């Protein structure tokens, strides 16, 4: 069901998503887990809805619809929160396929909706992909994959994409194969676009867009959420570009290959090549054959189209070339502006029709349009499993030949590159290439001519129909009316014109038949007629489409020209934009630096401006305070008041004297006056406290000056700051000056206070005198008392005024102090911010250094990874060389078969004979097809039987491969050890050959002869001299014989080892030759099969061709199965032989009960030292005796040994199993053995020096399975042998 509204679409897709997740909710994750095509399409549909909603006002609504969908009765939002659990132990919670899909889709949807900055998206995806790696590592689900939507990819830079890629590439334990391939494709695509490739294909919908110059697999398109209904635009130079739109059917079963529909992209722009539906089999992939195959690694059909079962997906390193695109079906591009094509047609089936062949050929095809009221179900050929598609007249076959020619030209180019300038096949390759080019040009010309003729045929056919209708109408008129000669003349003229038109049409038809016969490369009876009938069948279906296409092209030509001009201008603008982007990026970096500096200076300037404003306010307030202080001072310094007080005091004194004289007074009034005087004194003391506050303010100003000096030192490089500091300095000078004025005012206040103190003292004296007067009984007159009260009130008023001025001055100084404190706090805050900014800058510098070091380490890791993959590249090069040699052999076979067309003529004669027999059979059966139908059914039964056999062979092959997995370790081990053995053989060839082997045998024979001679002499000496005098000599000779026997055994073991290596080399070469023969036989069978298929495709019954193809497939699979079985048997035989040789060698060469023989010196035997590859458990060493032995054994025998044996000269290659035997060094001074030196002394001496002279030998076959690197084993276990 097709939905047009976005909200309705989102609702439907959310329900489908919830249903699919419920189905997969209990499927546990494992190595076989994977998403089907239906599940991938459901995920793509819901993510597309979220992406489309980003450009509308419904984005939050679409996301809420998804969140509110229910899974198992619970909303998706709650289920997601339960699974995520704040990122704690996510890998343990996501243990099923349904939970995996829900977790990834909700994460991507939330990221698309809420994140717009690339840094935020990168941080989220880094954490998310680490969780994905943990899940894959725990469950081994390497085939699970839900890629990043294009809406998020477009917001990321390439550096961020590479960092996300490193999350997967560094997690070696996590099996994230498809994620790695996804990011590898993004990297390859980006660097091809950056390199300036003008050939590209662009796909876009809504805010998402993606461009690629190479083929794009379907799983990449699904991950980027693109569909075949999106807008597609391609470069004009891309001629062979195809878009796959749908999976039609599966071959045999779902595990085999499938047949897909594709659309060839002829135009530069499409609004979609298929209809926007929710089909479960919908596919979208881009195949680009116009680019070099060495760049496009996804051209291979196995990589381009993902199989239905995800576990059958193969990686790039495992696939073989597969370009079976001929089996897919081409369909026309969908155009939403045109009417839908007729899909339900009633066509008579070929096996159910009757009548003669001629009647069938002349009978037109009946096309019945389906009506909604019809009760009959229309025939759908795609639902019929026995349906055989009829060959229609299209350019598909020629286009396929065009693809084959392009592929052959590409292969020939590679062969020419491999052959070089002096290759013997160069001339043949050039000739073949020239012929292919000519054939390509001829096909192109014929193809263009056929298209022209087809268009003309359509036009002429329409005209014939139109004229036929007119003729019929004219005949009806002529038969119905007999009056008027003018009308008959007109009719005759019209009929004449129509006959001329018919003649021209016949000539055009004849020319078309000739062209078709020419293309068929021969005159075939009735082929042109049949081709025309088939072309009519096809043209009838596409009649309306072609008419609309012609009209559309006429109307769009000017639009295309305008678009081309716009594209050129856009390219020019793009170049200018790239240049502007680089310039802008440089300017942005510079601007960011300047902005940081400006911000810093702006902060300082703002702080200084605030300080300046505050200082201006302080200056104004200080002026006000100064004016008030001056007034107060003037008031306090008013001498008139002081004189008045003095005169008043004198008057009081006089009156006091009068009172004393008069002897009377008012004691109550005097006491009240005394209390009033004490209050005045208290107020004077409070005024005195202002001086201490002024001194404290002076100290605060000094502290502010010190802090301003510190700020000046921190900003000494800033000229503006210095000027501002200078102004502050001047202001501080003014403040100091004002402070000095205040101090002078305070000094004047101190004088006033001293004067008042003196007056208080005077008043106290007066009070004392008054009290004395009271005691004397004197009184005062009421008049004088009133005057004193009035004066006291005046003094109180003056004191209040002075106190008020002092309080105002105190409040002003207090406010100034608060502002100064606030200024200090602001300066401290600015200083703290500057220090924090310095710390932040240093932190960023450290982070930058750390990131640079990390980049260097990653580059080292990349180089290391390239070094480790060098062997893989070499193997790939060797496989390419093998493929080139196969192609050369195939080319030689083609040349040998190309000289004569006998086979082709024979095939054509056979086809003609089969056709004649078929016609006679049909005529003999009176038009009935019973026999044909019988044989057709028999052929179908045979096909079904062969399919069952093929399925059984597939299962056998699968079981064989599963059984082979058990031996995969041994196979890899054997292959690795083979490589090592080859290296060892190369080293052995430098030191050992047939002559050296013969020399070793000769030395062994000489030593045996010498041993026999010594035994004979010993027996002769024992029989002739049977006394104690020869006991020591006999013992010495026996020990010498024992040592020689040890040397002989070692020499024989060396010879046996060499013989084993030679036998292994022979077997290895035989097996390699056998494998090569098997490969050649298999490739020859494949080539024969391809030629047979090509021969059958030239003509014949479709059932016969299908039967032959099935038989060839069965044979090919049998060959593959036999080859796989032979490989398994060969690996098992080699492994058993290797183990048998190693076990036999160990049991034969080592005796656990054998004790090591003591080493004694013996006379020098001129024999070159021998080396061995086999290892004994306890090797016997010949050790020189101690140097203090001087007496000989007998006068006639003087044994000589090497005092310090030298090591043999080893090759520079340390991986060889054996050493080179060298010529012994010249004899040193001969030490002598004392006759009193007994056996124990010699044995102890040998044991003391044994640790220095013992060398270890190689136990090759025993330890071969335990080591991964034989070079390391040889370096650690082989020590040079000392020469005896």
From Swiss-Prot:
Biased composition (Basic and acidic residues): 348-357
Keywords, alphabetical: Late protein, Repeat, Virion
Tagged with keyword Repeat: yes
Region called 10 X approximate tandem repeats, residue ranges: 611-912
Coarse class of the protein's main subcellular location: virion
Domain of life: Viruses
Extent of the Sequence repeats: 611-637, 638-665, 666-689, 690-720, 721-751, 752-780, 781-811, 812-842, 843-871, 872-912
Segments for region (Disordered): 340-383, 1169-1234
Other facts: Some orthopoxviruses such as cowpox, ectromelia, and raccoonpox viruses, form large cytoplasmic inclusions within which mature virions are embedded by a process called occlusion. In those viruses, A26 bridges mature virion with inclusion bodies through interactions with proteins A25 and A27 on the mature virion membrane.
Biological function: Structural protein that forms a matrix surrounding the mature virion (MV) through interaction with protein A26. Presence of protein A25 in the virion structurally prevents direct virus-cell fusion mechanism.
PANTHER family per record: GRIP DOMAIN-CONTAINING PROTEIN, MYOSIN HEAVY CHAIN, NON-MUSCLE
Quaternary state and interactors: Interacts (via N-terminus) with protein A26.
Family designation: Belongs to the poxviridae A25 protein family.
Annotated protein name in UniProt: A-type inclusion protein A25 homolog
Organism encoding this protein: Cowpox virus
């Amino acid at each position: 069901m097709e939905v047009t509204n976005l909200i309705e679409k989102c609702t439907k897709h959310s329900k489908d998503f919830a249903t699919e997740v419920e189905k997969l909710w209990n499927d546990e994750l494992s190595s076989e887990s994977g998403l089907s095509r239906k599940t991938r399409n459901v995920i793509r549909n819901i993510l597309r809805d979220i992406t489309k909603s980003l450009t509308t006002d419904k984005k939050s609504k679409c996301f809420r619809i998804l969140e509110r969908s229910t899974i198992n009765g619970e909303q998706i939002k709650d289920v997601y929160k339960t699974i995520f659990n704040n990122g704690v132990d996510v890998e343990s919670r996501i243990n099923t396929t349904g939970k995996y899909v829900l977790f990834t889709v909700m994460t991507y949807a939330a990221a698309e909706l809420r994140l717009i900055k690339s840094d935020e998206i990168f941080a989220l995806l880094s954490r998310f992909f680490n969780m994905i790696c943990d899940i894959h590592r725990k469950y081994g689900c390497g085939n699970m994959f839900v890629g990043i939507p294009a809406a998020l990819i477009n917001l990321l830079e390439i550096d961020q994409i590479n960092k996300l890629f490193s999350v997967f590439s560094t997690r070696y334990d996590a099996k994230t194969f498809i994620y790695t391939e996804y990011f590898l494709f993004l990297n390859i695509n980006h660097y091809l676009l950056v390199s300036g490739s003008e050939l590209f294909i662009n796909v876009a919908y809504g805010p998402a867009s993606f461009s690629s110059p190479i083929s794009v697999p379907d799983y990449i398109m699904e991950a980027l959420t693109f569909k075949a209904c999106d807008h597609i635009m391609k470069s004009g130079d891309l001629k062979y570009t195809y878009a796959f739109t749908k999976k039609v059917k599966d071959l045999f079963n779902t595990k085999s290959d499938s047949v897909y529909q594709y659309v060839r992209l002829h135009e530069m722009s499409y609004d979609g090549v298929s209809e926007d539906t929710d089909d479960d089999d919908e596919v979208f992939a881009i195949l680009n054959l116009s680019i070099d195959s060495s760049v496009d690694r996804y051209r291979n059909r196995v990589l381009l189209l993902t199989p239905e079962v995800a576990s059958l997906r193969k990686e790039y390193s495992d696939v073989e070339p597969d370009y079976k695109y001929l089996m897919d079906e081409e369909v026309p591009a969908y155009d939403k502006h045109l009417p839908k094509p007729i899909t339900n047609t009633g066509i008579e089936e070929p096996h159910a029709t009757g009548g003669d062949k001629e009647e069938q050929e002349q009978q037109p095809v009946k096309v019945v349009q389906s009506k909604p009221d019809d009760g009959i179900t229309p025939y759908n050929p795609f639902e019929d499993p026995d349906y055989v598609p009829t060959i229609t007249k299209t350019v598909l076959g020629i286009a396929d030949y065009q693809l084959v020619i392009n592929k052959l030209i590409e292969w020939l180019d590679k062969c020419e590159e491999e052959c070089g300038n002096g290759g013997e096949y160069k001339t043949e390759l050039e000739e073949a290439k020239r012929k292919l080019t000519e054939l390509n040009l001829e096909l192109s010309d014929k193809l263009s001519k056929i298209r022209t003729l087809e268009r003309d045929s359509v036009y002429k056919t329409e005209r014939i129909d139109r004229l036929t209708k007119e003729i019929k109408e004219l005949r009806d008129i002529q038969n119905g009316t007999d009056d008027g000669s003018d009308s008959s003349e007109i009719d005759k003229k019209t009929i004449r014109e129509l006959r001329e038109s018919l003649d021209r049409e016949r000539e055009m038809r004849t020319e078309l038949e000739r062209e078709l016969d020419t293309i068929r490369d021969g005159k075939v009876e009735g082929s042109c007629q049949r081709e025309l009938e088939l072309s009519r069948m096809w043209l009838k279906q596409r009649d309306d489409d072609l008419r609309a296409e012609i009209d559309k092209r006429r109307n769009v030509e000017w639009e295309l020209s305008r678009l081309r001009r716009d594209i050129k201008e856009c390219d020019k603008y793009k170049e200018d934009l790239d240049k502007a982007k680089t310039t802008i990026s440089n300017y942005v970096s510079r601007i960011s630096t300047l902005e940081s500096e400006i911000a810093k200076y702006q902060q300082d300037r703002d702080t200084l401006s605030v300080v300046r404003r505050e200082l201006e306010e302080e200056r104004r307030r200080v002026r006000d305070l100064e004016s008030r202080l001056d007034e107060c001072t003037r008031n306090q310094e008013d001498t008139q008041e002081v004189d008045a007080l003095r005169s008043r005091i004198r008057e009081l004194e006089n009156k006091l004297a009068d009172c004393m004289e008069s002897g009377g007074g008012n004691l109550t009034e005097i006491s009240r006056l005394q209390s009033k005087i004490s209050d005045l004194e208290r107020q004077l003391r409070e005024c005195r406290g202002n001086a201490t506050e002024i001194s404290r303010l002076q100290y605060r100003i000094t502290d502010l000056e010190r802090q301003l000096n510190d700020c000046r030192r921190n900003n000494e490089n800033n000229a503006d700051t210095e000027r501002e500091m200078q102004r502050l300095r001047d202001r501080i000078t003014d403040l100091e000056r004002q402070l000095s004025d205040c101090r002078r005012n305070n000094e004047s206040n101190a004088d006033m206070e001293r004067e008042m103190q003196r007056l208080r003292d005077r008043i106290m004296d007066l009070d004392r005198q008054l009290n004395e007067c009271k005691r004397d009984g004197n009184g005062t007159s009421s008049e004088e008392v009133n005057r004193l009260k009035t004066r006291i009130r005046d003094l109180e008023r003056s004191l209040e005024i002075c106190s008020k001025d002092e309080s105002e001055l105190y409040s002003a100084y207090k406010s100034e102090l608060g502002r100064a404190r606030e200024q200090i706090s602001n300066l401290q805050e600015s200083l703290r911010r500057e220090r924090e900014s310095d710390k932040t800058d240093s932190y960023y510098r450290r982070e930058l250094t750390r990131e640079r070091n990390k980049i260097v380490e990653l580059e080292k890791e990349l180089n290391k990874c390239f070094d480790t993959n060098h062997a893989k590249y070499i193997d790939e090069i060797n496989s390419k060389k093998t493929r080139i040699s196969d192609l050369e052999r195939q080319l030689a076979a083609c040349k040998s078969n190309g000289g004569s067309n006998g086979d082709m003529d024979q095939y054509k004669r056979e086809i003609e004979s089969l056709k004649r027999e078929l016609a006679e059979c049909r005529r003999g059966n009176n038009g009935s097809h019973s026999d044909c139908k019988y044989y057709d059914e028999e052929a179908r039964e045979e096909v079904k039987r062969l399919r069952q056999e093929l399925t059984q062979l597939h299962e056998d092959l699968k079981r064989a491969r599963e059984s082979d997995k058990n031996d995969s370790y041994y196979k890899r081990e054997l292959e690795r050890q083979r490589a090592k053995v080859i290296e060892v053989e190369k080293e052995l060839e430098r030191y050992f050959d047939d002559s050296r082997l013969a020399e070793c045998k000769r030395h062994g024979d000489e030593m045996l002869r010498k041993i026999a001679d010594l035994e004979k002499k010993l027996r002769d000496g024992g029989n002739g001299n049977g006394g104690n005098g020869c006991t020591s000599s006999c013992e010495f000779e026996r020990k010498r014989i024992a040592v020689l026997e040890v040397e002989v055994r070692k020499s024989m073991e060396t010879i046996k080892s060499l013989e084993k290596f030679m036998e292994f080399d022979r077997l290895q070469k035989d097996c390699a030759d056998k494998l090569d023969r098997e490969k050649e036989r298999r490739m020859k069978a494949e080539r024969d099969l391809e030629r047979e298929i090509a021969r059958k495709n030239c003509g014949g019954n479709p059932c016969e061709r299908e039967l032959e193809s099935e038989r060839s497939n069965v044979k090919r699979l049998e060959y593959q199965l036999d080859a796989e079985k032979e490989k398994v048997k060969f690996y098992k035989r080699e492994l058993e032989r290797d183990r048998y040789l190693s076990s036999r060698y160990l049991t034969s060469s080592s005796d656990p009960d054998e004790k090591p023989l003591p080493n004694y010196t013996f006379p020098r035997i001129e024999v070159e030292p021998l080396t061995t590859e086999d290892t004994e458990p306890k090797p016997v060493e010949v050790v020189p005796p101690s140097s203090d032995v001087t007496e000989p054994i007998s006068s006639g025998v003087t044994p000589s040994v090497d005092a310090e044996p030298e090591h043999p000269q080893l090759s520079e290659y340390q991986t060889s199993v054996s050493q080179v035997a060298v010529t012994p060094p010249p004899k040193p001074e001969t030490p002598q053995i004392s006759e009193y030196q007994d056996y124990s002394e010699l044995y102890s001496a040998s044991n003391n020096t044994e640790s220095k002279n013992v060398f270890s030998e190689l136990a090759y076959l025993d330890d071969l399975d335990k080591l991964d690197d034989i070079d390391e084993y040889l370096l650690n276990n082989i020590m040079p042998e000392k020469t005896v």
